[in-house]
């Protein structure tokens, strides 16, 4: 759905700690996809403890077992992970109540062009979750990077007006409300432009579409209709329909396997 689930504003720079907090809004059997730098025994332990599955992009120096897997010709194995004694002592000093146990982790490896991707997952059933599905799932995480660009370049999220923590929180929350509102419109538009039939499902990701809504244009269209949506309540239905139909015309063909460098000509915000 590409809808935001949770956000956090913290004074520390520990993204792993924020990730642990985000797990509180999820349910067992949900799946979280992480980029490089997030994997740790503590985060893996929390996922196993909560029943929330994880897919980590692994770095070669994550552990000796992972380093050996990088160097091997194997592409799909299962290991048992237990921190070294010094690492266990460090974990206990910070989390004295944490029970350190051997944890199972599935390691997967594949190559795209000149890049080798190594993933660690708690989805252990190789028959139910084959390697090729992980390739598509991890690639879907690229949408997060695209959202960062949209947030910084279009919503200019880093240009805060408030000078207080509470005010900044409100601005971030308002930003995610706008992202959610635009996603609801673009998801429905994706369904319509690819089916040509009245839609009955709320899930636009049933099949890989051949067309997709241009999300940036969607934002600009909704921006032009926002004042009417907020203040002209008697016309809200007509405005929603007009905005939606306009968004449906702002689409482009899906371009799979894009590998060239993207460069924006837009000046950086000061």
Residue positions per predicted region:
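Single, function-defining residue in the core of a domain
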Residues: 1-270
């Amino acid at each position: 759905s590409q809808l935001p689930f949770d956000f956090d504003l913290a004074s520390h720079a520990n993204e792993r700690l924020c990730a642990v907090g985000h797990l509180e809004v999820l349910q067992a059997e949900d799946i979280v996809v992480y980029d490089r730098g997030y994997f740790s025994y503590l985060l893996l332990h929390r996922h196993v403890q909560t029943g929330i599955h994880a897919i980590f992009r692994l770095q070669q120096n994550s552990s000796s077992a992972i380093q050996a897997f990088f160097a091997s010709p194997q592409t799909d194995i299962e290991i048992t992970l237990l921190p070294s004694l010094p690492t266990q002592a460090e974990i206990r000093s910070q989390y004295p109540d944490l029970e350190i146990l051997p944890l199972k982790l599935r390691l997967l490896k594949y190559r795209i062009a000149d890049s080798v991707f190594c993933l660690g997952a708690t989805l252990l059933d190789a028959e139910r979750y084959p390697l090729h599905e992980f390739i598509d799932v991890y690639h879907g995480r690229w949408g997060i990077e695209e959202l960062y660009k949209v947030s910084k370049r279009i919503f200019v999220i880093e240009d805060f007006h408030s000078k207080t923590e509470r005010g900044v929180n409100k601005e971030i929350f308002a930003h995610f409300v706008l992202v959610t509102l635009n996603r609801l419109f673009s998801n429905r538009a994706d369904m319509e432009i690819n089916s040509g039939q009245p839609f009955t499902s709320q899930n636009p990701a049933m099949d890989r579409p051949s067309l997709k809504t241009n999300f940036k244009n969607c934002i600009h269209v909704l921006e032009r209709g926002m004042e009417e949506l907020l203040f002209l309540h008697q016309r809200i239905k007509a405005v929603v329909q007009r905005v939606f139909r306009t968004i449906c015309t702002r689409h482009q063909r899906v371009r799979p396997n894009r590998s060239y460098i993207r460069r924006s000509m837009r000046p950086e915000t000061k």
